């Protein structure tokens, strides 16, 4: 099978950018079984309700859903199992510090295959937005749409 030369997005967490203020992002690898990779290659995954947590000095992706591979029979994986994230020790220490000291959270933004065909997760260090911040974001979005519409009508 020929490898793709471009990045293929499998799952996108668009709600995270609305609900959280993204401070920093980094790329992490995932420990996956064979049937999970096959299911991801078909484009099946959901990271909307997932988050990352530090447990025992390691970082885990919790509550992500990768459905069973239809041809996997008895070797199939559990769809909502915890998945270990592959990061350097320096990155793990920085994430653990941000979560514990600064009260931030780790939110997955995007699950994709890189140009070498390896599954990667774009992980964000984020701070939760308050309700008034979310309303302000909606107002800004509506105003920018209105501006674009007005400019299109005039010019």
From Swiss-Prot:
Family in the record: Belongs to the SmpB family.
Role this protein plays: Required for rescue of stalled ribosomes mediated by trans-translation. Binds to transfer-messenger RNA (tmRNA), required for stable association of tmRNA with ribosomes. tmRNA and SmpB together mimic tRNA shape, replacing the anticodon stem-loop with SmpB. tmRNA is encoded by the ssrA gene; the 2 termini fold to resemble tRNA(Ala) and it encodes a 'tag peptide', a short internal open reading frame. During trans-translation Ala-aminoacylated tmRNA acts like a tRNA, entering the A-site of stalled ribosomes, displacing the stalled mRNA.
Subcellular compartments: Cytoplasm
Name of a matching Pfam family: SmpB
RNA-binding is among the record's keywords: yes
Record flagged with keyword Cell inner membrane: no
NCBIfam families (alphabetical): PRK05422.1, smpB
Gene: smpB
HAMAP family the record matches: SmpB
Protein name (record): SsrA-binding protein
Organism: Chelativorans sp. (strain BNC1)
Database matches in Gene3D superfamilies: 2.40.280.10
Single Gene Ontology MF annotation: RNA binding
Keywords: Cytoplasm, RNA-binding
């Amino acid at each position: 099978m020929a490898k793709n030369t471009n990045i293929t997005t499998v799952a996108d967490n668009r709600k995270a950018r609305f609900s959280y203020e993204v401070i920093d992002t980094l790329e992490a690898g995932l420990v996956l079984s064979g049937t999970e990779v096959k299911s991801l290659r078909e484009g099946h995954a959901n990271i909307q309700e997932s988050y990352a947590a530090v447990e025992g000095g390691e970082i885990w992706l919790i509550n992500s859903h990768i459905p069973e591979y239809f041809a996997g029979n008895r070797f199939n994986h559990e769809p909502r199992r915890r998945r270990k994230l592959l990061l350097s020790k320096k990155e793990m220490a920085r994430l653990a510090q941000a979560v514990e000291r600064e009260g931030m959270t780790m939110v997955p933004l995007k699950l994709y295959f890189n140009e070498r065909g390896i599954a990667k997760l774009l992980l964000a260090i984020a701070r939760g937005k308050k309700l008034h911040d979310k309303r302000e974001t909606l107002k800004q979005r509506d105003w920018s749409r209105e501006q674009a519409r007005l400019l299109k009508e005039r010019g």
